[in-house]
């Protein structure tokens, strides 16, 4: 897996870790590039949140820094040096080849992973995900929210037990 592969190249290690950070925060590449922990995080009930503004749209977003993301932040002393998007995606392509991934791996895939695998698969409402991603309309978030078969099956079981 991308998390466990042994990488000898320092640049590949950093990009891998930053990609995983994106998977657990939903940040786009440009928001990761501009991320400043001291300037845009707040703490509430012992959980750190990114309280920021999307670079692309200027829309406010508010998302938790989940434990795996916080571990990565600590590893890099809360500061990332993010390469250009081209270099970032080139590194991800190399990593994908090393782990035998057939589909292309890009920084934007991390944002989709956050939306589907991390958030929606754990029954977080789409309206909450929309706020986390900094979308002004839930209809934009629905592009990310391809309904997962497992979610349909789980809810069907719940409905069958009620009816």
Language-model-derived ranges and their functions:
Residues 159-163:
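C-terminal secondary-structure termini that scaffold catalytic or DNA-interacting sites
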């Amino acid at each position: 897996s991308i998390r466990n592969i042994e990488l000898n190249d320092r640049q590949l290690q950093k990009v891998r870790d930053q990609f995983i950070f994106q998977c657990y925060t939903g940040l786009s590449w440009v928001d990761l590039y501009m991320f400043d922990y001291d300037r845009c995080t707040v703490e509430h009930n012992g959980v750190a949140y990114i309280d920021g503004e999307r670079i692309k749209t200027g829309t406010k977003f508010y998302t938790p820094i989940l434990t795996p993301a916080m571990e990565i932040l600590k590893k890099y002393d809360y500061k990332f040096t993010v390469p250009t998007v081209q270099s970032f995606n080139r590194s991800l392509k190399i990593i994908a080849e090393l782990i035998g991934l057939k589909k292309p791996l890009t920084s934007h895939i991390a944002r989709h992973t956050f939306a589907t695998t991390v958030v929606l698969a754990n029954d977080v409402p789409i309206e909450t995900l929309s706020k986390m991603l900094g979308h002004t309309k839930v209809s934009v978030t629905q592009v990310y929210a391809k309904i997962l078969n497992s979610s349909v099956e789980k809810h069907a079981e719940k409905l069958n037990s009620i009816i």
